[in-house]
Swiss-Prot record:
EC number: 4.1.1.19
Reaction(s) the record says it catalyses: L-arginine + H(+) = agmatine + CO2
Protein name: Biosynthetic arginine decarboxylase
Organism encoding this protein: Shewanella halifaxensis (strain HAW-EB4)
Binding residues for substrate: F286, D287, V288, G289, G290, G291, L292, A293, V294, D295, Y296
N6-(pyridoxal phosphate)lysine modified-residue sites: K101
First-tier enzyme category under EC: lyase
PANTHER family with a match to the protein in the record: ARGININE DECARBOXYLASE, BIOSYNTHETIC ARGININE DECARBOXYLASE
Pathway assigned to this chain's UniProt record: Amine and polyamine biosynthesis; agmatine biosynthesis; agmatine from L-arginine: step 1/1
Length: 637
């Protein structure tokens, strides 16, 4: 592909679409980031940045955060709603609430809060879904509007802490997930002398589509049915506390790809709001929950990895539906709240790491089978002769199916001793050579060739062994088949020489990325430029800022990676700050209740028993360094 261009690379990885202008490919084929979206002309090369970090002692893999992207996402979302409110003459305001479950890292939460620090009236609050999250939020919310929303199941301690938050000056909304929570809230509020701010999570009949659709619908784990909502109203009236019901909440699920689902959910919840107001409730806030999606594959579609709407359309739909409904039922317009954590955080973080080795199929010369070889082998040789153009052509699809069938039968005969090891090896080599020739002969412009091309790409793909743990750094890729954009960080000015799959360094066959963004679709392999030990390149995993860190596990005892915060200063200089060391071997041993100190004593006993005296000090030093070392491979330089 001598006419390969940078535009071809951008289209191949679809980077201009999934990145929303935050990441790109430079004219010299290097992946770049615009760390401050307000200055898109200021770009940083990720490849050189990673190499500089390594030189300064930060080993790969490293998770890099760009806090100015967080600021931009917060302000963009607030601006979209502010403009929609003005457009539809909505008679209230908008509040963005960050659910810290999406990414509880202190750096992330503080940077999100800092994005509104210069606003006269901050449009930002925090959400907690558990006691530990609430304890964090109580301390951090003072830097925002001091609005706190408490979701999740609650015991007496959780409820008391939330009420204490009210005494501390916060506006704490306790959202009732179960009807039994109401009694505890009222009892503890009376004991503490606090007037509670109550919210209701309603269980909608409508259920959105997607991987998290179980968050909504009549069988949802959370929320109150219509009958239970009426029970709450009755109980509050009896206690003369109906004015305490200030918030209505619903949640369709994370990553809602279709704007119609969002519109329909808001419409049904809006009817709940109007009915509650008719019953005398004092609902001031309408909380649409999460659902604002991230376009992971850049296709702007209804795929579970994508979204068929933009930020403006999202805000316009919510505001317009509520405007029309409140006017129709002559009800006041409530403050609109959204809990859009995935949208805020996904783009701000990228994992950078090295390839430690590759395994690729290289065509080898093959000889015809012996005359007395089984007929199956002669059949396979005939397929090779025909596909290589040395005999009359048959349909390429027929050759493929025949050769695959013959190889399957060879394997069966080997299992029962009718074919030897050398014959099996020969058959496998012929099959690979046939597949290799077919891959170059078939064309995607023929629809009936496409499924076989996909199968051949997967069968002949290079294996890239990458220095990371899928289970630690991209758990959703393993757990729910989530797609994350993956790109080589350099060499993209050259045409791809092969297709590859990315394998992690865990001892688990599931540690493989199975889906890749490729053009306007998803493929099982990734186009890559040539990689050699003499001319290696790094790999970037993008849009990993939401959920991945907190969901990551320590399979094979691979721990947290190193991380760093990178910021662009006023003079457009790159500042690497807040470098946080990843887990050491001793750290992860402690997590599973293994005592590194006692291990060291055991090593000393073994060294004294088995190692010559002049070697003991060096061996002990290596063992000690092993405990202090990074859990990932450290050979890259």
């Amino acid at each position: 592909m001598s006419n390969w261009s940078i535009d071809d690379a951008r289209a191949s990885y679809n980077v201009n679409h999934w990145s929303q202008g935050l990441y790109g490919i430079s004219d010299d084929g290097e992946v770049t980031v615009s760390p401050d979206p307000s200055r898109p002309e200021c770009k940083i090369g990720l490849n050189e940045m990673a190499k500089d970090m390594v030189k300064s002692g930060v080993a790969l893999p490293v998770l890099v955060r760009f806090p100015q992207i967080l600021h931009h996402r917060v302000n963009s979302l607030c601006q979209a709603f502010n403009q929609a409110i003005q457009k539809y003459q909505y008679e209230n305001d908008y509040l963005l609430v960050y659910p810290i479950k999406v990414n509880q890292q202190q750096t992330v939460v503080e940077e999100i809060l800092a994005s509104q620090v210069e606003k006269e009236v901050p449009q930002l609050g925090l959400e907690a879904g558990s006691k530990p999250e609430l304890m964090a939020v109580l301390a951090m919310a003072q830097k925002a509007s001091s609005v706190i929303i408490c979701n999740g199941y609650k015991d007496k301690e959780y409820i008391r802490l939330a009420l204490i938050g009210e005494k501390l000056g916060h506006k704490v909304y306790i959202v009732l997930e179960k009807i039994s929570e109401l009694k505890v809230v009222l009892e503890q509020a009376k004991e503490l002398g606090v007037t509670p701010r109550l919210g209701l999570r309603v269980r909608l009949a409508f259920q959105g589509k997607g991987k998290w659709q179980a968050s909504g619908g009549e069988k949802s784990k959370f929320g109150l049915s219509a009958a239970q909502v009426l029970q709450v109203i009755t109980s509050l009236k009896q206690e003369n506390m109906l004015d305490s019901l200030e918030l209505l909440h619903f949640h369709l699920g994370s990553q809602i790809a279709n704007i119609r689902d969002i519109r329909q959910g808001v419409s049904e919840a809006g009817r709940f709001y109007c009915e509650l107001m008719k019953l005398g409730a004092n609902v001031k806030c309408f909380d649409v929950g999460g659902g604002l999606a991230v376009d992971y594959d850049g296709t702007r579609s209804q795929s579970s990895h994508s979204m068929n709407y933009g930020l403006t359309e999202y805000a316009n739909n919510i505001v317009s539906v509520l405007t029309d409904m409140c006017k129709e039922y002559e009800q006041p317009m409530p403050r609109i709240i959204s809990e859009s954590g995935r949208y805020l955080t996904a783009h701000h973080a990228v994992l950078l790491t090295d390839v430690i080795g590759t395994e690729a199929y290289k065509p080898e010369d093959i000889q015809p089978p012996a005359e007395d070889a089984p007929q199956l082998l002669h059949n396979m040789w005939q397929s090779w002769v025909e596909v290589s153009g040395k005999a009359d052509q048959r349909a390429l699809i027929e050759i493929f199916h025949d050769c695959q069938s013959d190889l399957t039968e060879v394997h069966s005969l080997f299992a029962v001793g009718q074919v030897g090891l050398a014959e099996r090896a020969w058959a496998e080599q012929v099959n690979l050579r046939v597949c290799y020739e077919l891959q170059g002969s078939m064309s995607a412009k023929y629809r009936f060739h496409r499924p076989i091309i996909d199968e051949l790409n997967e069968k002949l793909a290079d294996k890239f062994f990458v220095n990371f743990s899928l289970f630690q750094s991209l758990p959703d890729a393993w757990g729910i088949d989530q797609v994350f954009p993956v790109m080589p960080l350099s060499g993209l000015d050259k045409a791809p020489e092969s297709r590859a799959v990315m394998l992690d360094i865990t001892c688990d066959s599931d540690g493989t990325i199975d889906q890749y963004v490729d053009g306007q679709g998803i493929e099982t392999t990734l186009p890559v430029p040539a990689w050699t030990q003499e001319s290696p390149y790094l790999i970037g995993f993008f849009l990993v800022g939401a959920y991945q860190e907190i969901l990551g596990d320590m399979h094979n005892l691979f721990g947290d990676t190193n991380s760093a915060v990178v910021r662009l200063d006023e003079d457009a200089r790159t500042n690497v700050e807040s470098v946080l060391a990843g887990d050491t071997v001793a750290d992860v041993l402690r997590y599973v209740n293994l005592d590194a100190v006692s291990f060291m004593r055991t090593y000393e006993e073994l060294v004294n028993k088995h190692i010559a005296e002049d070697e003991r000090a060096n061996i002990l030093e290596e063992l000690q360094l092993g405990l202090k070392g990074y859990t990932y491979l450290e050979d890259f330089s």
